């Protein structure tokens, strides 16, 4: 064969193939873990923080119980199954925009964007979004998913006569024509902020750089003048530093969350509230609560007062998303010198309002300024705690005797009696069981779930609810069941509880059954953003073999 013909054959048979570029709208990895959702609050006592260190620039889509899309507003730390949740700092694109770049921020230690990276986003024809997510440089960071409000067939949104959905202020209609996505006000004129704009759910806020604070208009910033101006706003000591200044407290007091006010230490527990007042602050005063029979006891360094939510004149109220217990510690001069040698006083009266906050869904002290006149010295003591419930399995329909040592082995035709019981019985409060579901394992985020109660509604017609004398207790009966499969011989129950005020006719508890779409558990405006706690009971062994 001639050389020219051989070369011609070689050139006609060797072809170069162009690499196939796949559309990320059809080539993506699904993220469907329930703990990714913004409703999932991380509890370090129950699990370890998670991290997305396995990601390496692939395309992802949020599906299932993880949510519909990434949140475009700041997510508080300790959500989405980790310490530092990652959110999208920018609006989602339109379908015609193609692939766009957005900043993703991790929230931690009060900073909505302590860490950031760049991700790519694309709006797909099916009304959903895909994301090209980078591997976080440090742990513990997780990319969050979120369920956005939708206009459903029952018109829980604002539906127009044209069957189109009108979204609430701060949101806009997504490409699917029914989902209301959060608007990022910071993308328009920086939200009106002179320096830093932080996008929040349905709103935004302005912030300032180091050494600067917001003016009263909430938009512009001014320099912090330091300790020489009004003591820097510190209730006690003000120390200058290169970055500005910092406040410090005398021994026995602690700095409050505002980083300016020194507080009396207070420990909030459902069983007792403990206030510890430094002896130097008390001097020759005698401390007592609203009920004057409840008095402080000195241990040499502190005067301690311990009381419960039901004693010593404690007042319990429901305020927004919290249960608030309050009392007042009053200090008056002793009639005679005490055994500790107090023979002088430096103030004529001491007032310490004590406040403990507990989350509704299953939470400290201001300055000591010497005052020698007759005006009372006031210190605020404030802290957070947990208002606990237990999920009990009972022996019969009287709901008086729960299984304690060992849980029962039941047959499929038996009745299962279970209930939510408060560890502390407080009048003026009531509860709503927002959801109860069963799993074959003790894991709350188990993929295989069977709902008995959902959105405050009974979702299984065989579930029967019993009345209870205590507004906080809830009792139920359901026929025994098991999960399909010979290996599934146990059943675990998990319930979420919300606490409200009995007299609040507009509360989520008063509304009762409230169906929502695409939610793991019913969430009304009244309970949005509340701290959640899931109660777990079991295992219940099933004797199913005939």
Swiss-Prot record:
One of its GO terms (cellular component) is cell surface. Residues 261-516 form the ZP domain. Coiled coil: none annotated. Residues 1-16 form the signal peptide. The keyword Disulfide bond applies. Glycans are attached at residues 89, 116, 299. Residues 524-546 are annotated as: Disordered. Residues 182-222 form the EGF-like domain. Keywords: Calcium, Disulfide bond, EGF-like domain, Glycoprotein, Nucleus, Signal. The keyword Disulfide bond applies. InterPro entries: EGF-like_Ca-bd_dom, EGF-like_dom, ZP-C, ZP-C_dom, ZP-N, ZP_chr, ZP_dom. GO terms for biological process: renal system process. Pfam families: D8C_UMOD, FXa_inhibition, Zona_pellucida, ZP-N. One of its GO terms (molecular function) is calcium ion binding. Disulfide bonds join 186-197, 193-206, 208-221. It is found in: Nucleus envelope. It comes from the Eukaryota. May be involved in hepatocellular function and development. This is Oncoprotein-induced transcript 3 protein. The gene is Oit3.
């Amino acid at each position: 064969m001639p050389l020219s013909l051989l070369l011609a054959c070689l050139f006609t048979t060797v072809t170069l193939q162009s690499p196939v570029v796949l559309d990320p709208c059809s080539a993506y990895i699904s993220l469907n873990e329930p703990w990714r959702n913004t409703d999932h609050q991380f509890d370090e006592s129950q699990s370890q923080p998670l991290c997305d260190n396995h990601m390496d620039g692939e395309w992802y889509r949020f599906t299932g119980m993880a949510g519909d899309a990434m949140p475009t507003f700041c997510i508080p730390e300790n959500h989405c199954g980790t310490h530092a949740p990652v959110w999208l700092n920018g609006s989602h694109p339109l379908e015609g925009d193609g692939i766009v770049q957005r900043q993703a921020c991790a929230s931690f230690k009060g900073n909505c964007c302590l860490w950031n990276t760049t991700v790519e986003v694309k709006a797909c024809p099916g009304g959903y979004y895909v994301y090209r997510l980078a591997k976080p440089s440090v742990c513990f960071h997780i990319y969050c998913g979120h369920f956005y409000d939708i206009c459903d067939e029952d018109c829980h949104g604002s539906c127009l006569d044209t069957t189109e959905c009108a979204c609430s202020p701060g949101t806009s209609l997504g490409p699917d024509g029914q989902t209301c996505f959060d608007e990022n006000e910071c993308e328009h004129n920086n939200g009106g902020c002179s320096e830093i704009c932080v996008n929040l759910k349905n709103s935004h806020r302005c912030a300032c750089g180091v050494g600067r604070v917001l003016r009263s208009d909430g938009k512009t910033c001014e320099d912090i003048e330091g300790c020489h101006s009004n003591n820097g706003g510190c209730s006690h000591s003000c120390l200058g530093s290169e970055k500005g200044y910092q406040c410090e407290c005398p021994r026995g007091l602690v700095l409050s969350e505002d980083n300016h006010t020194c507080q009396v230490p207070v420990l909030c527990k459902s069983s007792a509230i403990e206030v510890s007042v430094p002896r130097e602050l008390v001097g020759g005063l005698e401390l007592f609560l609203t009920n004057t029979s409840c008095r402080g006891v000195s241990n040499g360094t502190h005067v301690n007062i311990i009381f419960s939510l039901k004693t010593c004149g404690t007042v319990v109220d429901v305020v927004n998303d919290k249960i608030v217990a309050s009392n007042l510690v009053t200090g008056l001069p002793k009639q005679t010198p005490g055994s500790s040698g107090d023979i002088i006083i430096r103030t004529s009266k001491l007032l310490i309002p004590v406040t403990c906050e507990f989350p509704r869904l299953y939470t400290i002290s201001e300055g000591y300024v010497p005052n020698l006149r007759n005006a009372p010295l006031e210190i605020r003591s404030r802290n957070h705690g947990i208002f606990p419930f237990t999920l009990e399995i009972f022996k019969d329909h009287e709901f008086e005797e729960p299984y304690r040592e060992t849980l029962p082995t039941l047959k499929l035709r038996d009745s299962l009696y279970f209930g939510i019981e408060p560890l502390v019985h407080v009048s003026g409060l009531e509860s709503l069981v927002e959801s109860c579901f069963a799993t074959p394992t003790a894991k709350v985020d188990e993929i295989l779930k069977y709902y008995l109660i959902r959105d405050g509604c009974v979702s299984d017609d065989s579930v029967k609810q019993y009345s209870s004398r205590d507004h906080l207790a809830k009792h139920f009966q359901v026929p025994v069941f098991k999960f399909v499969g010979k290996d599934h011989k146990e059943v675990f129950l998990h319930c979420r509880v919300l606490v409200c005020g009995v007299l609040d006719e507009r509360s989520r508890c008063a509304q009762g059954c409230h169906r929502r779409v695409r939610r793991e558990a019913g969430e009304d405006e009244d309970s949005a953003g509340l701290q959640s706690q899931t109660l777990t009971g079991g295992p219940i062994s099933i004797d199913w073999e005939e």
